[in-house]
Amino acid sequence: MLARMNPSKVIGLVALAEKPGLGEALRIMRRELSRHGLGSCVIETPDALEQAIVRCSMLVTFGGDGTMLTVSSLAAAHHVPLAGVNLGRLGFMTTCSVQELPLLAYALQEGSFLTDERSMLEVVRMGVDGIAVPPRKLALNEVSLIRAQSGKMVDLDAEIDGE
């Protein structure tokens, strides 16, 4: 269980894709967070997310699993907890529905929630000299590798916990 949210920081509300019901969901969440004394900021682009994440004590994504996957690597790199509001159909990874936003805001204010640490995949491209070439990338669930040129062999090493 986590302690109360840091009042000097804000809850980042991440809305990267226009979805039906998004505007209403953001309005409800901002109202509920304000009722509980928590500040918030709406983040609508990946560039804005990279700038805002340092001010956020928590990120709440609005969309579905795709939005969660998009945001997860940056959240993990900054050690910022992530919750998801399902605006789509399935939302296996999301935390709650729009109807549950008042409960989510209350839980954030009270610190009455648990975090589930997920294993992340780290992708590192190595140069011919054996030195890592920046940037390293984090991913949740899966990684796709694509050859730069067709007809060439790909040399791939995979490690799990250094083995």
Identify what each model region corresponds to.
Residues R30, S72, D155:
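Short glycine-/small-residue-rich flexible loop motifs, especially phosphate/cofactor-binding loops
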Residues M1-M58, F62, Q99-L114, R125-K137:
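ATP/NTP phosphate-donor binding region
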Residues R27-E32, A76-A77, I160-D161:
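Short, solvent-exposed amphipathic alpha-helical segments in soluble enzyme
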Residues H79-P81:
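Proline-centered loop/turn at the N-terminus of a beta-strand
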Residues N86:
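Divalent-cation-assisted or electrostatically stabilized phosphate/pyrophosphate-binding catalytic cores
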Residues A25-R27, S72-A75, T95-S97:
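Short amphipathic alpha-helical segments
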Residues L90-E163:
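Catalytic core of DAGKc-family lipid kinases
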Residues G66-V71:
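Short glycine/serine/threonine-rich phosphate/pyrophosphate-binding segments
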